[in-house]
Amino acid sequence: SSDLTVSKFYEPGAFAEFFSGSFTFIADAIDSTPSKVDLLLECVQRDIPVISSMGTGNKLDPTYLAVEDISGTSVCPLARSVRKQLRAAGVKKGVTVVYSKEPVQRAEAGEVPGSMVFVPASAGLLMASYIVRQIIAENS
């Protein structure tokens, strides 16, 4: 919506400011690696179910998207960075992610990785589907 104004972004250490109360699930689509890792660590420490979207920049084929534990990811540079930082904090597995197995297409020097709307949108749909299926399974 053109009327929407984002006044705050999640930053490391801001969990309590953004999330009070209890949650059934958190869906993460943060682009900043330090903020993403902080949120994931907070969710793990608080035992809050979370699914995190990894990089969809410079991707063209949503059929390469997969839902897996962070420990099983490959190809995706963002997943590699997040996995390394989580491991350094003592978290080796237990964080579910959506990531692309599509071969990496490097952006030109100085360019921001672009994305086709259907790849991040498909990642979001996979996340939503995963959350709904987990809630149904938990309540069955």
Q: Across the structure, where does each feature detected by a protein language model lie?
A:
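Glycine-rich phosphate/adenylate-binding loop
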Residues: 21-22, 32-35, 45, 50, ...
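Short, well-structured alpha-helical segments in soluble
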Residues: 15-21
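Residues at the C-termini of beta-strands that transition into short coil/loop
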Residues: 9, 54, 101
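ADP-ribose/adenylate-binding Rossmann-like module
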Residues: 25-70
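Hydrophobic/aromatic beta-strand patches that form the interior of the parallel beta-sheet core
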Residues: 4-6, 27, 51, 96-98
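Conserved SAM/SAH-binding loop
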Residues: 6-15
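Generic structural signal for helix capping and beta-alpha/helix-loop junctions
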Residues: 13, 60-61, 105-107
